[in-house]
């Protein structure tokens, strides 16, 4: 259907260019449909983005929570390393996959260079997941404030998305 064509085209374009640098006309042209259908099906570019992002972010958030629950269930107090593996491994698996999962990873990396404000509406599941990881890390790192844990997780995520967005950059910078 036209709606599915728009979703697939938007996902590819958002992955390649981010949110700001993609127009509704460009999405419609890639989908080979009338641009008015973006408004008809989604209400606009922002809502289309939200649907595309949510469709991929929800499974990632769910897998992260499953990983965290497995770590906390098997051990009373998991290590920081185990918690961070639960945070990163689902994302790393996305990077090794082809198709929609890899597109989501690239889309996340590209929008990380933009302001995240347009993505906020699509992130309630990610917010809950982030909060659960912060809570788990705080139990392991009681000497750190909540803000310090949050910023450290942000920096970890930022370093990872930079590595995805600019392949080979971290290796080059390490020389």
Put a short name on every predicted segment.
Residues 5, 13-47, 51-55:
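Helix-turn-helix
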Residues 165-173:
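Transmembrane alpha-helical segments of integral membrane proteins
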């Amino acid at each position: 259907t036209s709606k599915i064509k728009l979703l697939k085209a938007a996902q590819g374009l958002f992955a390649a260019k981010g949110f700001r640098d993609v127009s509704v006309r460009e999405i419609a042209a890639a989908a080979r449909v009338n641009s008015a259908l973006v408004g008809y099906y989604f209400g606009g570019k922002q809502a289309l983005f939200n649907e595309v992002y949510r469709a991929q972010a929800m499974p990632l958030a769910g897998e992260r929570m499953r990983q965290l629950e497995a770590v906390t269930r098997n051990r009373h107090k998991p290590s920081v390393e185990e918690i961070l593996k639960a945070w990163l491994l689902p994302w790393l698996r996305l990077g090794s996959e082809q198709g929609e999962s890899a597109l989501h990873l690239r889309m996340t990396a590209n929008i990380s260079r933009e302001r995240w404000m347009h993505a906020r509406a699509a992130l309630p599941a990610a917010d809950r997941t982030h909060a659960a990881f912060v809570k788990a890390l705080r139990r392991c790192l009681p000497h750190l404030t909540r803000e310090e844990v949050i910023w450290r997780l942000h920096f970890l995520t930022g370093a990872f998305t930079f590595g995805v967005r600019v392949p080979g950059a971290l290796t080059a910078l390490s020389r």
